[in-house]
Amino acid sequence: METTLILGSNSFSGATFADFVLALGGHVVGTSRSAEPNNAFLPYKWHDNKNFTFHELDLNKHLKELMELIQDIKPAYVVNFAAQSMVGESWQNPSDWFMTNAVSTIKFHDELRKYDSLKRYVHVSTPEVYGSCSGFVGENFAFNPSTPYAVSRATADMSLRTFYTAYNFPVVTTRAANVYGPGQQLYRIIPRTILFILLGRKLQLHGGGVSTRSFIHMKDVCDATWKVMTDGNNGETYHISTDEVISIRSLVERICLKLNVAFDDHVEFVGDRIGKDSAYHLDSKKIRAKLGWEDKTSLEQGLDECISWVKSNFEILKQQPFDYQHKP
């Protein structure tokens, strides 16, 4: 099978997609700006995968080395999960978010477009570019970003539109909301809630937890990403989401119920974060109709898997940072 290059392979999404491709018999090369983290956060390390190699490369500092790697391994597919994430924190050092998500990413695109052997470039974007919305949002919905993070991501997205038009660059874009699953970073709501309950710590619930989201298991996102990568149409965007909508409070209540604890004993309410979108729900009819994709993992099943993962790795996880660690 052809080689797939995954940028941001240390990320939850990137590591899980690497594991997905390897399970299909593919060859995967991963890059991230930091050394590989603990194996508990790397699903591709949970199986005997021999077709994965890792290179520590920073998109902001090692563009030349990254392009040399591409020329050496000649991947048919490049999937980019690499980005400065964390919406709230982007207000504190916005230039860092713009450097990674806009400037360095666009520089990479400008080099990658000159690579002749590329079959498909998958740009993993975010629904944050739409801002707060009512109802279900389709792929052609206008951008209305409300945070530095969202603006930085929208910048690269719009740049890619011009690259497709001007150069026929073989790009497809995905937006998924909201991903979760075993191996996710501990500052995300689901693993954080589970871990804090098991540790007897109080979870801070911003804005009372009234904001609503859809949660989709990363296994389903991997399946969708694979279909987009292999069968999608260049220049198009595909939304990956479920139709189930739940408030953050209800999500935490559901986890408390599964762990047999009282919600009020483990939660404290704090003010909302600046620029936080109250809701964005993605319409995924397109990928279902055009590529035959469907989500298969219910939230109930997915939460059980996450609880099992936290319990199985509890001694390791309780020693890890619980909060996002910013790195310029």
Predicted ranges, named:
Residues 94, 174, 186-187, 232:
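Active-site loop immediately N-terminal to the catalytic Tyr-X3-Lys motif
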Residues 186-194:
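A glycine/serine/threonine-rich, flexible loop-to-helix segment
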Residues 65-73, 111, 196, 224, ...:
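CheY-like receiver
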Residues 155, 159-163, 193, 251, ...:
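Hydrophobic alpha-helix immediately C-terminal to the catalytic Tyr-X-X-X-Lys motif of short-chain
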Residues 122, 132-134, 168, 184, ...:
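Proline-centered turn/helix-capping motifs that create local helix->coil transitions or kinks
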